[in-house]
């Protein structure tokens, strides 16, 4: 009798571990989105229609010197690719301000390292 309960306990434990592991994997995949449009050097749109502004950087606004190059660089990095989004908050333009990762590498840092964006330590979410 004790052996039967022991076997049932092990089987139930394995089942629960598999169930919860699969649930964690599903939850993790919810943070990944495909980039469908790059608006400028620090903003893009995902397959869900969400507008994302990359946290902690400031790229030239469209029409200013370097703006098209910054947009093109960001596009080459992430357009039509899956990125991980770690959301922070919405800004005054209703964009989600987020850290963005491509294959585990910070897109925020790549934009600054490339020279097409500057680090922005501003705590304000109103920064355009």
Name the predicted role of every residue range.
Residues 2-128:
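Small beta-barrel nucleic-acid-binding modules, primarily SNase/OB-fold domains
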